[in-house]
Amino acid sequence: MKLHHCLSFLLVVTLVPAALSLEDVAPLGANQSSYNASFLPSFELSAGSYSGDDVIIVKEGTNVSLECLLTVDQYGEVHWYNSKGQQLHSRGGKWLVSDNFLNITSVAFDDRGLYTCIITSPARASYSVTLRVIFTSGDMSVYYMVVCLIAFTITLILNVTRLCLMSTHLRKTEKAINEFFRTEGAEKLQKAFEIAKRIPIITSAKTLELAKVTQFKTMEFARYIEELARSVPLPPLILNCRAFVEEMFEAVRVDDPDDMGERIKERPALDAQSGIYVINPELGRSNSPGGDSDDGSLSEQGQEIAVQVSVHLQSETKSIGTDSQDSSHFSPPSDPASAEGSIHHRVSI
């Protein structure tokens, strides 16, 4: 319960009983006194009471004395009646009728109402007066105020306790995170697990509020946890299975012919020992006897193949070319640079 809500409730509780008491003490125009015009009534009241024309207002617990004074030589017998129509006898106690006096001892809230005095001789006359009692004992406003104060006290204690618990938890969590950043090695992983136990899972509004407070350090801690998870070694069985699958894919991998040329262009320069060359298909077939055996394959559609060759020095290349010309009567190539194997060609098979 918020403070301004509690104050508003206290204000309402204070004003409602005041309005009820004003309703009780308001004069009623409907209660008109009826009396004989030949008699002038008068009432004598005790201290602490208030007298109006036909309404008497007294506080609860006070004593009141009503006297009916008539301008006649002799009084006849006076009878008093309450608002319920019951005649009040002069037997003492709370209601005391003495001559023309009505004494009420310790007025209660239930005594409010219309009181009538009647005189039967020498002439019949009557007079009515309304008695109003101000309610002072057992006030409901006090009850509501006590209930409101108790509820406010309980709410305040719960809020203060919750704030203290959250503050303590935040201080401990921040201290653990700072220690985590200062540790290194295997101890850091142990600190990480300790912090993970302290950080709650966001499942309600309270834990969401806690997460907002520690959002920055929690995210920073999560990044460290990810790095540590990458450094944790996998089980040997998983590692062997992964290596086996990688070797299997390497064995059955088939290169796409359309992407072969692009990959060769992007490949870095070959070292001086070996390389892969693509032979140009526009270049004519050799005049070797082995080549004459499959002349019909010239009309077939060309395909690209990867040929792995070894690169020799220039002197070795010239000697090899001379020996091959003497033995096989090969025609020398038009481009001398092709003998060194420094360019790429395509061949049709």
Curated annotation (Swiss-Prot):
The keyword Disulfide bond applies. Residues 161-349 are cytoplasmic. SUPFAM superfamilies: Immunoglobulin (SSF48726). Keywords: Cell membrane, Disulfide bond, Glycoprotein, Immunoglobulin domain, Membrane, Signal, Transmembrane, Transmembrane helix. This is Microfibril-associated glycoprotein 3. SMART domains: IG (SM00409), IGc2 (SM00408). Residues 311-331 have a biased composition (Polar residues). Residues 280-349 are annotated as: Disordered. InterPro entries: Ig-like_dom, Ig-like_dom_sf, Ig-like_fold, Ig_sub, Ig_sub2. Residues 22-139 are extracellular. The gene is Mfap3. Residues 1-21 form the signal peptide. One of its GO terms (cellular component) is plasma membrane. The keyword Lipid biosynthesis does not apply. It is found in: Cell membrane. Residues 41-130 form the Ig-like C2-type domain. It is a single-pass type I membrane protein. Component of the elastin-associated microfibrils. It comes from the Eukaryota. Glycosylated. Its main location: membrane. Glycans are attached at residues 31, 36, 63, 103. PROSITE patterns: IG_LIKE. Disulfide bonds join 68-117.
